[in-house]
Each structure stands twice: as C-alpha cells, then as structure tokens.
C-alpha cells in the first residue's frame, strides 16, 4: 500500500529532512509556542513547502484552522525561519531591556513588563494597519535631537548603547520621516 504523506514543522529544514518518505513537506506555523499546550492562534500564517497534491491538502487544512498559508521554496526556508526567530528575539529582548529601565523609575517588574508590552502592542497594531514607517513616533521621527541627547545623558553605557542601536536600526531601515 502507498505510504501516507508526512510533514514536519521545523521551519528552517527542507522537506528532504524526512527522506526516504516519498511524499513529504513542511507545514510550519509562523507563531511562537512557549509551551507544548499553546493553541494555534486564528490568522496564524503557515509556511507550506510541498509538492502537489500534498501542498493543496496542507493549504486546505490551514484554512480549516482559520489560518493563512504561504507557499515557500525549500531554499527560502532558512530565511523564512530566521525572520521568525529574529522577530521574537528582538521583541523579547526589547521588553526586557526597556522593562529594566522602567524598574529604575519605580515600576514593579510586572508593571514594567505590562507597560512595555502595551506600548509595543499599540505600535504593532499601527504597523500592521499602515506599515512600520507610519507607526513610528518619538524624537527620531520628529527630528528632535535635543530629546535624544537628554535620553543618552540619562542612560548608563549599556542602556545608551541599546538605545543608539535601536535608533540606528530605524534609520538604516529608512523608517524615520
């Protein structure tokens, strides 16, 4: 009897990782799973890398979950997965760095984390609606060099370096108006 198809969910690995299974593919949710019981969120994007008819079956399954499928070439899987990893890591590092800064101002750790996450959520909503450049606010976007200087003067070396890195990233991406 023919073997059933097999897929794996490792975003950076090609379908060949399942050799010698004849019908194989990748079906990777672009979502963080901090626990084994984290449910797939509606509207999650799934990267699909498979030949036909498996690709059609995976796209249909993705839609049944209320999610979206994007077709990927095997050679693009490491780039795709690196984007996912970097997005999460940069976000979480920013929550930690900025949260620590707020605790120096009297916030409890939980207050600081909540405040930073709420701030980010608003910016991310705007970025999703209108693009990253439209979501950018603050002194860099206004060309307010005086405020940037005051920020840098108030920060220790570690936090000043992190702040400058964030400004450079925004400038390098052409997001400031």
List PLM regions with ranges.
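Glycine-rich, flexible loop/turn motifs
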Residues: 23-29, 36, 68, 76, ...
């Amino acid at each position: 009897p023919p073997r059933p198809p097999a897929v794996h969910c490792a975003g950076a690995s090609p379908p060949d990782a399942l050799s010698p299974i004849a019908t194989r593919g990748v079906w990777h949710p672009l979502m963080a799973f901090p626990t084994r019981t984290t449910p797939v969120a509606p509207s999650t994007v799934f990267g699909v890398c498979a030949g036909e008819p498996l690709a059609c079956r995976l796209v249909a399954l993705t839609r049944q979950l209320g999610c979206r499928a994007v077709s990927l070439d095997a050679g693009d899987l490491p780039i795709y997965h690196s984007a996912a990893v970097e997005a999460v890591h940069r976000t979480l590092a920013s929550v930690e760095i900025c949260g620590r800064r707020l605790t120096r101002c009297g916030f409890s750790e939980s207050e600081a984390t909540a405040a930073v996450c709420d701030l980010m959520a608003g910016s991310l909503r705007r970025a999703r609606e209108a693009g990253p450049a439209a979501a950018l606010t603050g002194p860099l976007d206004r060309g307010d060099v005086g405020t940037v200087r005051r920020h840098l003067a108030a920060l220790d070396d570690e936090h000043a370096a992190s702040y400058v890195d964030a400004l450079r990233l925004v400038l390098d991406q052409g997001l400031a108006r």
